Amino acid sequence: MDKKVRYKLRKVKKRWVTVSVASAVMTLTTLSGGLVKADSNESKSQISNDSNTSVVTANEESNVTTEVTSKQEAASSQTNHTVTTISSSTSVVNPKEVVSNPYTVGETASNGEKLQNQTTTVDKTSEAAANNISKQTTEADTDVIDDSNAANLQILEKLPNVKEIDGKYYYYDNNGKVRTNFTLIADGKILHFDETGAYTDTSIDTVNKDIVTTRSNLYKKYNQVYDRSAQSFEHVDHYLTAESWYRPKYILKDGKTWTQSTEKDFRPLLMTWWPSQETQRQYVNYMNAQLGINKTYDDTSNQLQLNIAAATIQAKIEAKITTLKNTDWLRQTISAFVKTQSAWNSDSEKPFDDHLQNGAVLYDNEGKLTPYANSNYRILNRTPTNQTGKKDPRYTADNTIGGYEFLLANDVDNSNPVVQAEQLNWLHFLMNFGNIYANDPDANFDSIRVDAVDNVDADLLQIAGDYLKAAKGIHKNDKAANDHLSILEAWSDNDTPYLHDDGDNMINMDNKLRLSLLFSLAKPLNQRSGMNPLITNSLVNRTDDNAETAAVPSYSFIRAHDSEVQDLIRDIIKAEINPNVVGYSFTMEEIKKAFEIYNKDLLATEKKYTHYNTALSYALLLTNKSSVPRVYYGDMFTDDGQYMAHKTINYEAIETLLKARIKYVSGGQAMRNQQVGNSEIITSVRYGKGALKATDTGDRTTRTSGVAVIEGNNPSLRLKASDRVVVNMGAAHKNQAYRPLLLTTDNGIKAYHSDQEAAGLVRYTNDRGELIFTAADIKGYANPQVSGYLGVWVPVGAAADQDVRVAASTAPSTDGKSVHQNAALDSRVMFEGFSNFQAFATKKEEYTNVVIAKNVDKFAEWGVTDFEMAPQYVSSTDGSFLDSVIQNGYAFTDRYDLGISKPNKYGTADDLVKAIKALHSKGIKVMADWVPDQMYAFPEKEVVTATRVDKFGKPVEGSQIKSVLYVADSKSSGKDQQAKYGGAFLEELQAKYPELFARKQISTGVPMDPSVKIKQWSAKYFNGTNILGRGAGYVLKDQATNTYFNISDNKEINFLPKTLLNQDSQVGFSYDGKGYVYYSTSGYQAKNTFISEGDKWYYFDNNGYMVTGAQSINGVNYYFLSNGLQLRDAILKNEDGTYAYYGNDGRRYENGYYQFMSGVWRHFNNGEMSVGLTVIDGQVQYFDEMGYQAKGKFVTTADGKIRYFDKQSGNMYRNRFIENEEGKWLYLGEDGAAVTGSQTINGQHLYFRANGVQVKGEFVTDRYGRISYYDSNSGDQIRNRFVRNAQGQWFYFDNNGYAVTGARTINGQHLYFRANGVQVKGEFVTDRHGRISYYDGNSGDQIRNRFVRNAQGQWFYFDNNGYAVTGARTINGQHLYFRANGVQVKGEFVTDRYGRISYYDSNSGDQIRNRFVRNAQGQWFYFDNNGYAVTGARTINGQHLYFRANGVQVKGEFVTDRYGRISYYDANSGERVRIN
């Protein structure tokens, strides 16, 4: 038994000492060959020594057990508390002293006689010994405890951001979020928090020091490769991969008996060899689970345990192979295991949203190990804007370079002259498909749609344009150009002017109009813009479009097969079906469920996903001048379901518009925006054939043609009674009857197909040719078809067969342009005749091309002139992107297979021929889809040298894939249609059109190269591919030497693991007294290299020792923890509070910006990660605690202030307004902080809350109690103006903007405002002098010279000064009296200050004069001519009466006057009674 000597740093009485610990290592073969230790002079020479290896039999087991036990007892008997050194000398172990091999070998002796076969069960002693070694090591490790971790724990407990939870320590950032993969240095100590966020001890003592010789591998002799030739391996270009199989020398037949292998006996390389111990451990655990072995190994398991476990698994595998008699199951199992390893899956490819398939790789042009894949080209991003490699200064509408190179799959190198010639060859094939395939020119395509223009070399546009001119003569006249009208899918705003400058050989989309339709009509109400963009935001300003020929030709649309369809489906899937979906990687089941939601939503009034107002968009598209409309199949028929099987709710409206276009749509165009009622509408008029302007009178046809479209995008639209919508139909249409073609109703859109159907709805123009509509005609609607308003009107009296379309001219074109946007081009209609999501046919009759052929009459009735076919290519089914899932034709591996080898989604090649011929029979031109950007996974693989890049081809920082070998699906079969037709027409094309091959292409400066016919695609013709999920380490290499395993016949590069060659070696970490060294699983010592154990990485220097701490390696900065573990994708917080970030490859990011995920960036300066407010190139930017840059968001910075950072640049906004997500506005001052309180900005007096939000439409009370109001629109402080609050109360704000209080004279009115600023209306007010005023209930004006009755029915009178009068008053000839509180006296007695009593009438309130009055007690008074109650003896109306001093008349009483005379007054009449 070997003594395994392991050295450790131990702390003993505060001193570090080196301790060597011996542990048992089982040796399962003889040492006669000696142990060869790789040193600095180690050679890669590999010689098999299997002839020197003897076999251990089961009979020797007892000797081994005794020896192992005694050695273990000796090792464990050392005194625990002392430092002991055990001799490092090693004696040669007799084979009988070694743990026996549990299996025997069945082989043929030299004399031909078969050896005795022996079979045993798995040797439990071996496993027990391995387990004991692990236990012994653990016990030895605890002899002396390193107290450095204890010191770390003391520091952790003092850190305010660290919390202990369930015995573990976590670091929380200032937002309360647990930091993961985070390291900080505090008090000189390195504290590391792992991927879970928990603190992890990374002291030197945690290094795995388990080193084993490969002689302990039970089956090494038998598992060695049969020979080193390529025939003994499954390989790719002579390189081994994680899924490579090989032929071993022996097979453990039935899991029991070793037998020599045959040429059919291949086994997975991963059954025998693994790149690291960690990979082996995971393999063992994975296979145990697959094979029903109930045992799991963790990262404390030693190498010997894993070897024994792997041997057990191998025996199980072989037994199962014998039982099943095949290895198919094993291939599936191994492949599944491979996909679990980060080095062999997308985890190590660093996928994120920088590409439609999550990432791309670029092939190196000078790969030394893959010269067959090199290229002199791969010139990237040569878009129309950037064709020369520099941004063309002529084109400024798009300030980017107008696109990017890597779109999808195998990215074709369209800068390669050989490839360019092949693209021309393919284009010629498409344009002559009928002739070539069916010997029928009537089945040829007439034109092309160029796919993904902004992702290919723009040289292709010249190549295609030159071909169309040479072969089809499109530059000669309009008829030739229109007969071969080709279009581009080019999204950059620079592409159309570029195309125009290139001669308008093809036309591009009017993307501005598409966006206008989208945001003015199709979006939800709260996202809609105004309607004016529909008039002006386009390639054509349609305010008054009266030109014979537009400046630039174009086509227009609102939706397409891949625009506003698959993105909506994606949104549905992500929101309601699978929130974890990435990009466009859907399953068919997810798509099916999404369409159930999509189709239901289409029928809803309040839509969540689908477009609003589709019919309104088409009403403009199909009546607009100066652009060719393209109708999308999915707007007339459901996107899913069988072809043309199910109509949408918009079908009738669109069909009606298509048919009406033939009869009516012609002449000049005028559009207007009118503000009416509470919203706006737009009108669009076509004047009719022969009339370009409103003043043109035209002819008879003019009068019966033309159209008016009226649209609104507000469902709450209401016109005022006085509003008039005036639509000027033009001078040709004076006093003419018009009828509706389409009108909005409560239930949707009503179509009127004839004059008779609309007879009751006829309207007439006036003598100026104006149609006038009122509130009775136009209002907003909300239903599944319309969210707003639509009305389309046409003249009455047009013949049923009227056709106002214009034929193209054959007169020679002389302006150097091919396509002209004139009346003839305006007359064309394109039909995009497919949906990405239409169902797969279940029978012949359902194939798209079969259905098309049956419906050509319908297409002709619609006026379709150009039928855009789906891409007819047989689809890839690799499922790597949506296109290959739904098999729409854009994902293909053979560009010449148009249903030739088998039916595609749309039918067979013969079906295609019939469909084209049927369309041609109706005069409809047919357009092919030319897709030169990409090709999907080919059936054959190549090893390429690749670098992980973003969509522009720029290397992705932090990726492990940097000029590494990578397996790509880049080679076609050589037996497909490409092999037949590739390059086949180049000689013919050179003979017919030599000028095509003489032109030097712009991006390369050289012509196309027709000398090579591409019969088989391979990597040299591609720029690269999407990441394939195979990982950075799929092509296997030895970590220690960084040499790839290769089985080439060239001995210079033929290289294999020592294990496969039955050579002895060491494996794992070891401490040699100076430092830690490492031997790879291939048997080589690591020097000047990184080593990975699973996801853990280390570096070993020039002397082979593991490094720790900060290191500069080849000019790059790295950081390694005390146990050698490299920081990767980790943040290090230095003791000075600064941060550093170490990427996926462990490199410290040094300077500049780096993208980490879609739209997320970090910035670095000399290795320091920017955190907080940072000045960069004079601009202030913000980075959070994780270093992520704030873009397009508000941030509360450390000073507590709110700031906003630009969505694109990340620069802090200064001195400008910004709107937040809630639609609230903030103003950012000179320092970038959101201002608060009162502010004067640009002459406006504004107010901002403490949170920075601008006050609009609200009242604000300042610290002095002053009230202000800020306008609901501008936010300006209201001054010298009235404002009414939500409760209907009014305020008036003075010249300073403060609400006035008290009595005020405003605009000649005398008003009053309470202390809270509220104007008094319909209320009484008593001022500080006690004066009472009343303010009118409507105007609020102080009442003057007027009576007012209060709520209790009491009356007041306010004098000329507006104050309530008191006391006796003569008003309007009446003598009245008002109490001290201003209340008029009515029906009451009043005694004045002189004691005079008056009475005021209960109705009029007039003072009673010359009249009797009886009070409530029945007493009578008489008031004289002055209105005072009389007293004493009075003669009234001839009666002698008497009234007391209080005015009460005496009745039935005696009275003695002042002279002592006694009188008596009658008890009834009160008259004095004479006494005789």
From Swiss-Prot:
<feature type="compositionally biased region" description="Polar residues">
    <location>
        <begin position="43"/>
        <end position="81"/>
    </location>
</feature>
<dbReference type="GO" id="GO:0046527">
    <property type="term" value="F:glucosyltransferase activity"/>
</dbReference>
<dbReference type="InterPro" id="IPR027636">
    <property type="entry name" value="Glucan-bd_rpt"/>
</dbReference>
<comment type="similarity">
    <text>Belongs to the glycosyl hydrolase 70 family.</text>
</comment>
<feature type="region of interest" description="Disordered">
    <location>
        <begin position="102"/>
        <end position="141"/>
    </location>
</feature>
<feature type="repeat" description="Cell wall-binding 6">
    <location>
        <begin position="1214"/>
        <end position="1234"/>
    </location>
</feature>
<feature type="compositionally biased region" description="Polar residues">
    <location>
        <begin position="102"/>
        <end position="139"/>
    </location>
</feature>
<keyword id="KW-0328">Glycosyltransferase</keyword>
<feature type="repeat" description="Cell wall-binding 12">
    <location>
        <begin position="1409"/>
        <end position="1429"/>
    </location>
</feature>
<dbReference type="InterPro" id="IPR018337">
    <property type="entry name" value="Cell_wall/Cho-bd_repeat"/>
</dbReference>
<feature type="repeat" description="Cell wall-binding 7">
    <location>
        <begin position="1235"/>
        <end position="1254"/>
    </location>
</feature>
<keyword id="KW-0964">Secreted</keyword>
<feature type="region of interest" description="Disordered">
    <location>
        <begin position="42"/>
        <end position="89"/>
    </location>
</feature>
<feature type="signal peptide">
    <location>
        <begin position="1"/>
        <end position="34"/>
    </location>
</feature>
<dbReference type="Pfam" id="PF01473">
    <property type="entry name" value="Choline_bind_1"/>
</dbReference>
<comment type="function">
    <text>Production of extracellular glucans, that are thought to play a key role in the development of the dental plaque because of their ability to adhere to smooth surfaces and mediate the aggregation of bacterial cells and food debris.</text>
</comment>
<feature type="repeat" description="Cell wall-binding 2">
    <location>
        <begin position="179"/>
        <end position="199"/>
    </location>
</feature>
<dbReference type="Pfam" id="PF19127">
    <property type="entry name" value="Choline_bind_3"/>
</dbReference>
<keyword id="KW-0214">Dental caries</keyword>
<feature type="repeat" description="Cell wall-binding 10">
    <location>
        <begin position="1344"/>
        <end position="1364"/>
    </location>
</feature>
<dbReference type="GO" id="GO:0047849">
    <property type="term" value="F:dextransucrase activity"/>
</dbReference>
<keyword id="KW-0677">Repeat</keyword>
<keyword id="KW-0732">Signal</keyword>
<feature type="repeat" description="Cell wall-binding 5">
    <location>
        <begin position="1170"/>
        <end position="1189"/>
    </location>
</feature>
<feature type="repeat" description="Cell wall-binding 1">
    <location>
        <begin position="159"/>
        <end position="178"/>
    </location>
</feature>
<dbReference type="Pfam" id="PF02324">
    <property type="entry name" value="Glyco_hydro_70"/>
</dbReference>
<dbReference type="Pfam" id="PF19258">
    <property type="entry name" value="KxYKxGKxW_sig"/>
</dbReference>
<protein>
    <recommendedName>
        <fullName>Glucosyltransferase-I</fullName>
        <ecNumber>2.4.1.5</ecNumber>
    </recommendedName>
</protein>
<dbReference type="InterPro" id="IPR022263">
    <property type="entry name" value="KxYKxGKxW"/>
</dbReference>
<feature type="repeat" description="Cell wall-binding 9">
    <location>
        <begin position="1300"/>
        <end position="1319"/>
    </location>
</feature>
<dbReference type="GO" id="GO:0005576">
    <property type="term" value="C:extracellular region"/>
</dbReference>
<feature type="repeat" description="Cell wall-binding 8">
    <location>
        <begin position="1279"/>
        <end position="1299"/>
    </location>
</feature>
<feature type="region of interest" description="Catalytic; approximate">
    <location>
        <begin position="200"/>
        <end position="1051"/>
    </location>
</feature>
<feature type="repeat" description="Cell wall-binding 13">
    <location>
        <begin position="1430"/>
        <end position="1449"/>
    </location>
</feature>
<dbReference type="InterPro" id="IPR017853">
    <property type="entry name" value="Glycoside_hydrolase_SF"/>
</dbReference>
<keyword id="KW-0808">Transferase</keyword>
<feature type="repeat" description="Cell wall-binding 11">
    <location>
        <begin position="1365"/>
        <end position="1384"/>
    </location>
</feature>
<feature type="repeat" description="Cell wall-binding 4">
    <location>
        <begin position="1107"/>
        <end position="1126"/>
    </location>
</feature>
<dbReference type="GO" id="GO:0009250">
    <property type="term" value="P:glucan biosynthetic process"/>
</dbReference>
<feature type="repeat" description="Cell wall-binding 3">
    <location>
        <begin position="1087"/>
        <end position="1106"/>
    </location>
</feature>
<dbReference type="InterPro" id="IPR003318">
    <property type="entry name" value="Glyco_hydro70cat"/>
</dbReference>
